[in-house]
């Protein structure tokens, strides 16, 4: 029997490369989470999940590791502190967290708390986010930057927040916004703190490249900046502009694109300073990416640079341009939301079932006893008997052709149902035999690599793809997926992951593998009377807020966890997932009204003696219990 150890598992899931030293596999074969890359302390995910289930917290469970979040904030700030020191940069760096990346109150409050020592700020892009930002800032005195489209109410709220002492900057995205600002400044007499968003020619890379460039949704072109300056000067507001902002897209995969944007943005800054504007801050926006697949490449699910390289380039490029222009260096702001929160949350859920055909009949005896077989079936029998590594390619192609032929013959009425079933059974036997041969061949012939798809099983997991990792469906984003136990054993199944929605799109067929993107996930056969859990990693950015309620599957249970030296971990907060009545309420159904209508219907049935009183009572109890229960599946 082939030996297998946890290092082998780490390789096939590429865990060491995407895990950022925050995830590992222990001697038991379970995935562990570390509070920081340098920490030897860890939490065993399988033990944690078992403990949560004992506490009646059912899967799917979103695990939020607050120490990891704190560590990510620290690592970004540490990288910039080091870059400032190495480059003798004369100004400061400040992190702003864009609330849109993860708007959950407890998460934003934690970021505000952990980020105090770094003077962290919040970036908001809508009226609800503005209100949330003001609320969080009220207890923490956090600075706020306001981006996005703005109406008069938005602008007036910012003005009055400024008047009563909030540190808040209103960024002008369009000229018509500036006209509204001027109008409201005259009306209220309140002097704002302003910023200007610049539309750079530079573009990012990957899925969000269109966020930058001449056709970008936001920002002022150079000619519009000149017009804005004239308008500001005419109305006595030019000295209120303290910041310029640019953003060339999220998850920028190539560092050279970042450098190009920094040079262009810094040139705009120096020119505006030469024109007499008192700009103090350059907000370089987001874009600091996450290496989701561990390839350290420019592929859209990876990045070809580190946080340290990013920080160094930001500081160096801006300083270099400013020194050449003889202009004072600005304070630098970045909005690195994805890199801050992606790693800290993990979704864990149980596998409910697989599509393994446990009741498939064995046709061995029937085939042996048959006096005459359909020609197609006979050819498949012959291939199965004779196949070896030297006839592999030809036999594989013949097998594919014959199974297609069997389907056509069945549809035309020339094969019976039993004969088609025999053909399918033989096809499966041949593919398994091919697999056993191919596993010993290195490298695998290219034309045979896809044959494994025929062996791929479907593992049905207790979650909604659309609710918990919508980017996997919407933009084909890769997220690392790993079973959290039995990693000291060799996986014996290749699988796809299907959710429990009634939608054929609710299936994951692209995974992070040892050599990049792969079409199957290695898993273990499900043992009887054993729970098997799968973890979805690096899902802390955008997924929670983008998740939708397809089939009315609601928010999952969420648990906030911190490390504890004595007990291993502490549960800080448990946030119950949506009950059925809560999901129904989103679409205007009310629990009491549902019960009332059903009860009235049942009473008519009782009166007509179609339903017994006991049946009516039991059904109402069952319905009531369902309304109060979790939207996801139990036993």
Swiss-Prot record:
Catalyzes the biosynthesis of agmatine from arginine. It comes from Geotalea daltonii (strain DSM 22248 / JCM 15807 / FRC-32). One of its GO terms (molecular function) is arginine decarboxylase activity. It holds the Pfam family Arg_decarb_HB. This is Biosynthetic arginine decarboxylase. Keywords: Decarboxylase, Lyase, Magnesium, Metal-binding, Polyamine biosynthesis, Pyridoxal phosphate, Spermidine biosynthesis. GO terms for biological process: arginine catabolic process; putrescine biosynthetic process from arginine; spermidine biosynthetic process. It catalyses: L-arginine + H(+) = agmatine + CO2. Its EC number is 4.1.1.19. The keyword Transcription does not apply. The modification N6-(pyridoxal phosphate)lysine is found at residue 100. Belongs to the Orn/Lys/Arg decarboxylase class-II family. SpeA subfamily. Its cofactor is Mg(2+); pyridoxal 5'-phosphate. Substrate binds at residues 282-292. CDD domains: PLPDE_III_ADC (cd06830). It comes from the Bacteria. PANTHER family: ARGININE DECARBOXYLASE, BIOSYNTHETIC ARGININE DECARBOXYLASE. Pathway: Amine and polyamine biosynthesis; agmatine biosynthesis; agmatine from L-arginine: step 1/1. Gene3D superfamilies: 1.10.287.3440, 1.20.58.930, Alanine racemase (3.20.20.10), Lyase, Ornithine Decarboxylase, Chain A, domain 1 (2.40.37.10).
């Amino acid at each position: 029997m082939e030996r297998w150890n946890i290092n082998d598992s780490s390789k096939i899931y590429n865990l060491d490369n995407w895990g950022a030293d925050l995830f590992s596999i222990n001697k038991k074969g379970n995935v562990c989470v570390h509070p920081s890359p340098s920490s030897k302390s860890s939490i065993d995910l399988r033990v944690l999940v078992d403990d949560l289930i004992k506490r009646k917290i059912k899967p799917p469970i979103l695990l939020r590791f607050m120490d990891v979040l704190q560590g990510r904030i620290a690592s970004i700030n540490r990288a910039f502190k080091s870059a400032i020191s190495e480059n003798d940069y004369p100004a400061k760096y400040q992190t702003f967290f864009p609330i849109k990346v993860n708007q959950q109150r407890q998460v934003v409050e934690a970021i505000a708390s952990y980020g105090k020592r770094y003077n962290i700020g919040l970036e908001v892009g809508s009226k609800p986010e503005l209100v949330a930002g003001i609320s969080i800032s009220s207890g923490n005195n956090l600075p706020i930057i306001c981006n996005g489209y703005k109406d008069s109410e938005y602008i007036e709220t910012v003005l009055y927040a400024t008047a009563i002492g909030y540190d808040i900057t209103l960024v002008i995205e369009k000229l018509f916004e500036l006209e509204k600002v001027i109008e409201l400044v005259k009306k209220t007499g309140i002097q704002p703190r302003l910023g200007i968003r610049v539309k750079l020619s530079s573009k990012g890379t990957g899925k969000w490249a269109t966020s930058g460039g001449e056709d970008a949704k936001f920002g002022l072109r150079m000619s519009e900046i000149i017009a804005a300056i004239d308008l500001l000067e005419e109305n006595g507001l030019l000295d209120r502009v303290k910041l310029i902002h640019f953003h060339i897209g999220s998850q920028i995969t190539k560092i050279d694109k970042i450098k190009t944007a920094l040079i262009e943005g810094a040139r705009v800054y120096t020119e505006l300073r030469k024109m007499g504007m008192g700009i103090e801050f350059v907000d370089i926006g987001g874009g600091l990416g996450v290496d989701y697949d561990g390839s350290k490449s420019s592929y859209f699910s990876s990045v070809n640079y580190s946080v340290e390289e990013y920080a160094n380039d930001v500081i160096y490029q801006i300083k270099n341009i400013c020194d050449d222009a003889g202009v004072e260096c600005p304070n630098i702001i970045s909005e690195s939301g994805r890199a801050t929160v992606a790693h800290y949350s993990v979704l864990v859920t149980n596998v409910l079932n697989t599509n393994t055909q446990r009741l498939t009949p064995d046709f061995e005896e029937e085939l042996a006893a048959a006096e005459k077989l359909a020609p197609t079936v006979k050819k498949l029998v012959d291939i199965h008997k004779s196949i070896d590594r030297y006839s592999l390619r030809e036999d594989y192609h013949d097998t594919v052709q014959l199974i297609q032929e069997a389907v056509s013959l069945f549809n035309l009425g020339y094969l019976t149902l039993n004969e088609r079933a025999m053909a399918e059974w033989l096809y499966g036997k041949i593919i398994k035999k091919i697999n056993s041969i191919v596993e010993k061949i290195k490298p695998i012939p290219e034309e045979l690599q896809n044959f494994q798809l025929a062996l791929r099983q479907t593992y049905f997991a207790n979650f909604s793809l659309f609710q918990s990792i919508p980017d996997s469906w919407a933009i084909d984003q890769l997220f690392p997926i790993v079973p959290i136990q039995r990693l000291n054993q060799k996986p014996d199944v290749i699988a796809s992951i299907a959710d429990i929605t009634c939608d054929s799109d609710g299936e994951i067929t692209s995974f992070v593998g040892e050599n990049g993107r792969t079409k199957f996930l290695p898993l273990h056969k499900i043992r009887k009377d054993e729970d098997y859990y799968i973890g979805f990693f690096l899902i802390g950015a955008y997924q929670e807020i983008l998740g939708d309620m397809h089939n009315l599957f609601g928010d999952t249970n969420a648990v906030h966890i911190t490390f504890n030296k004595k007990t291993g971990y502490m549960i800080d907060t448990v946030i119950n997932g949506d009950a059925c009545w809560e999901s129904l309420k989103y679409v205007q159904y009310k629990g009491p009204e549902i019960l009332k209508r059903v009860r009235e219907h049942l009473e008519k049935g009782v009166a007509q003696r179609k339903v017994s009183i006991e049946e009516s009572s039991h059904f109402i109890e069952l319905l009531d219990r369902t309304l109060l229960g979790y939207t996801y599946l139990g036993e």
